[in-house]
């Protein structure tokens, strides 16, 4: 009966979460760098969950946090201990160890970096607390129950395949690209970089430079300002590995008098596809945006229900994602032998976006 109640409640809250988790950072109820109180055991059948979140560096992260707080609510039979780790790996390890001491039932980790997890995951195992990893990946895959997230390399490959088709349609014969990477060591950075570089190497494109913007608007602006000085007049593509970096890059290019987007001198590509940036695609400011779905929490709740029922969940679960374009000249792309649609952004498409 409890499982049926949880399933019904979760279906309702997912609808509310999808409607409410758009890109503004003001929407997340947790304070920046903050945490929720420790869980308290009261002998009830409430499921206690600890969530060690990366931080609050982007609109995507805000949507991810909001989704978890909506799903793992008291109304749904959960008590959530949430820690914003502020992009501090040591703080994240400490948060997980605190969850162990609190005796939570489950631990969710969105890892800041992929390495250095063996010891603390062993401690989770010894305490009998299942760990579920979301978004970014962890190298010690035998020490957690399930991972839920995106195929970051496929995102990078999709970006490259779209750029190839778009350039061919526009008669662009030479690609000179600048890349603003995400946080160093993050699996999203690694996957998107590897995927795009694979296509760039295959096509003989010139990647002029690739530097980290740390997934932040300030970082994206700083790197792009440097690029505009060092590579003035030499580049025709800018790849930003998340939306916030793209916002910073646009500010830098505006200040430098560089035009971008549809009809501009520079093709601008982003990742994440938060709703405000999908609107920028519709407006032609961003040429293409490759979604990274932040809504892992409902799937994590399903995994927890499976574990509560004594079932074995899948080890890897990929969330559904879409690719968005400002123009309709490239209808489909082929990624790893699979034909995938490019969604031409219209007002109807934008209105349907949940975040």
Where are these regions (language model features)?
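Hydrophobic alpha-helical segments within soluble ligand-binding/sensing domains
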Residues: 42, 49, 92, 148-175, ...
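Hydrophobic alpha-helical
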Residues: 97-101, 106-126, 196, 209, ...
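Short, low-complexity disordered leader/linker segments with a strong preference
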Residues: 1-48, 74, 122-129, 339-343, ...
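Flexible loop/hinge segments that line or gate small-molecule binding clefts
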Residues: 115-154, 176, 274-282
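Short, solvent-exposed amphipathic alpha-helices that sit
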Residues: 60-74, 78, 155-162, 187-205, ...
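Extracytoplasmic "Venus flytrap"
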Residues: 48-75, 80-98, 104, 110-114, ...
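Short beta-strand elements at the ligand-binding edges of bilobed clamshell
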Residues: 82-84, 139-165, 210, 283-294
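Hinge/cleft segment of the Venus flytrap/periplasmic-binding protein
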Residues: 38-41, 45-47, 180-184, 188, ...
């Amino acid at each position: 009966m409890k499982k049926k109640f949880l399933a019904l409640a979760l279906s309702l809250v997912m609808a509310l979460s999808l409607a409410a988790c758009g890109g503004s950072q003001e929407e997340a109820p947790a304070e920046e760098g903050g945490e929720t109180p420790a869980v308290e055991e009261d002998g009830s059948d409430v499921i206690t969950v600890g969530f060690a979140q990366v931080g609050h560096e982007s609109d995507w992260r805000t949507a991810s946090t909001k989704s978890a707080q909506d799903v793992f609510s008291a109304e749904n039979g959960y008590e959530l201990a949430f820690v914003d780790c502020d992009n501090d790996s040591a703080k994240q390890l400490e948060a997980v160890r605190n969850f162990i001491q609190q005796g939570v039932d489950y631990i969710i980790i969105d890892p800041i970096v992929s390495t250095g997890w063996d010891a603390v995951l062993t401690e989770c195992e010894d305490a009998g607390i299942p760990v579920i990893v979301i978004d970014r990946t962890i190298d010690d895959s035998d020490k957690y129950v399930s991972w839920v997230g995106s195929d970051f390399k496929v995102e990078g490959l999709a970006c490259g395949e779209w750029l190839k088709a778009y350039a061919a349609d526009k008669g662009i014969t030479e690609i000179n690209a600048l890349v603003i990477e995400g946080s160093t060591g993050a699996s999203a950075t690694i996957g998107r970089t590897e995927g795009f570089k694979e296509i760039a190497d295959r096509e003989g494109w010139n990647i002029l430079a690739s530097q980290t913007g740390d997934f932040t608007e300030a970082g994206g602006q700083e790197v792009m300002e440097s690029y505009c000085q060092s590579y003035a007049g030499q580049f025709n593509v800018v790849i930003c590995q998340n939306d916030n970096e793209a916002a910073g890059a646009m500010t830098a290019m505006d200040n430098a008098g560089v035009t971008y987007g549809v009809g501009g001198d520079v093709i601008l590509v982003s990742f994440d596809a938060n709703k405000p940036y999908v609107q920028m695609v519709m407006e032609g400011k961003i040429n293409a945006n490759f979604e990274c779905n932040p809504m892992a929490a409902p799937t994590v709740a399903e995994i927890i229900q499976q574990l509560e029922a004594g079932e074995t969940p899948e080890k890897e679960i990929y969330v559904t994602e879409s690719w968005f374009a400002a123009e309709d000249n490239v209808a489909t792309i082929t990624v790893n032998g699979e034909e995938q649609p490019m969604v031409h952004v219209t007002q109807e498409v934008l209105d349907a976006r949940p975040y």
